[in-house]
Swiss-Prot record:
It comes from Proteus mirabilis (strain HI4320). This is RNA chaperone ProQ. RNA chaperone with significant RNA binding, RNA strand exchange and RNA duplexing activities. May regulate ProP activity through an RNA-based, post-transcriptional mechanism. Residues 104-176 are annotated as: Disordered. GO terms for molecular function: RNA strand annealing activity; RNA strand-exchange activity. The lineage of its organism: Bacteria, Pseudomonadati, Pseudomonadota, Gammaproteobacteria, Enterobacterales. SMART domains: ProQ. The gene is proQ. One of its GO terms (biological process) is post-transcriptional regulation of gene expression. It comes from the Bacteria.
Length: 230
């Protein structure tokens, strides 16, 4: 006997059983309920099949009996069959109710999975459309045109960052120039011209060539008579 290729999946085993026992295992269409204890019958008939283990056979039977087309066949009036397709008794009400429950749960799972897939697809399409759509630009506010008869208001001029310097306060007092230094005394207060400004000063020393005065900031300087005023 030639070595047969090893069966790797439950679907391959089901196809093998449908070919080996066509009156028991239905490859297409509504399946017939199997005889109670069909697993032991299969083990006995397939004991010489080296490409098939008991574990693989049990998994294949579990897949076959949980399929929708098998659960549809478990109904009132249906009869169980053996490996040769012979009737082996009617189904019990408990088995029929169990099959209906399994079928309803299987349908609910499929519907939930499909709904989840549709939701993910819509979400993915929405993200794709959002990424393609350019960001909307904010419209620039349009200036309202003046109505007939109204004058356009001039734009306010921007103020300079630096405040304008205050003009030096002019000394409005009427001063008398010093013509004779002999009238001056040490410690006397008077006015002195410093550049374009008139500042307070105190007499420190009187000499022939001029008068030495001290300003409020502590600076001492020699000043000619024509720059002094009362």
């Amino acid at each position: 006997m030639e070595n047969q290729p090893k069966l790797n999946s439950s679907k391959e085993i089901i196809a093998f059983l449908a070919e080996r026992f066509p009156k028991c295992f239905i490859a297409e269409g509504e399946a017939r309920p199997l005889k109670v204890g069909i697993f032991q019958d299969l083990v006995e008939h397939l004991k010489d099949e080296t490409q098939l283990s008991k574990t693989q056979l049990r998994s294949a039977l579990r897949l076959y009996t949980s399929s929708w087309r098998y659960l549809y066949g478990v109904k009132e009036g249906a009869k169980r069959v053996d490996l040769n397709g012979n009737d082996c008794g009617e189904l019990e009400a408990e088995h029929i109710a169990h099959a209906r429950t399994q079928l309803a749960e299987a349908k609910a799972r499929v519907q939930a999975q499909r709904a989840e897939q549709r939701a993910k697809k819509r979400e993915a399409e929405g993200d794709k459309e959002t990424s393609k759509r350019p960001a909307a630009k904010k419209p620039n506010p349009r200036r309202q045109a003046p109505k007939d008869g109204e004058k356009r208001q001039p734009r306010p001029q921007k103020q300079a960052n630096q405040a304008p310097r205050k003009a030096p306060r002019q000394n409005t007092e009427k001063l008398t120039p010093v013509k004779d230094i002999s009238v001056l005394t040490v410690g006397q207060s008077l006015k002195v011209n410093v550049g374009s400004s008139v500042m307070d000063a105190t007499v420190l020393e009187i000499a022939k060539e001029g008068v030495r005065v001290q300003l409020p900031n502590g600076l001492a300087m020699n000043v000619r008579t024509e720059h002094l005023k009362f």
